[in-house]
C-alpha cells in the first residue's frame, strides 16, 4: 500500500466542506450540492494509514437518486491530483482557456461556469489519489 510521509495519523483531522450552487446548462438552471472531504483509509489493525480527498457534485433537484448515474474520475497518482480533470473539464466551474500555448500553459486563468459539465445528467465524484 502506498503511504505518504506527510500523512501523520496521530495529528490528522479529516476535513469536510459543503456548499450549494447553481449552474445554467442549455438555458436551464441546475441546482447542485457539493461535498469536498478527506476519506481516511484504515489498515488491517484499524489505524488510519492514508487519506484520499474527493470533490462530489450531486444534482439537488432529483427525486429518484437510486437510478441516477455517477461519474467517478481521477488523474494518475501518486503525485498527480485531479486538478486538471476537475478545473479543466468535469467540474461545475472550469478554467477559461481559448488556446493553451507554452507561455499561458500555467495561467493565471479566469474561472467560469462550465457549459460542458455533466451535472444535468450524472452526479460527479472527482478523486485525488493518495499522495496528491
Residue ranges of model-derived segments:
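N-terminal cap/lid subdomain of alpha/beta-hydrolase-fold enzymes
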Residues: 2-3, 48-132
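Catalytic-loop region of hydrolases
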Residues: 1-70
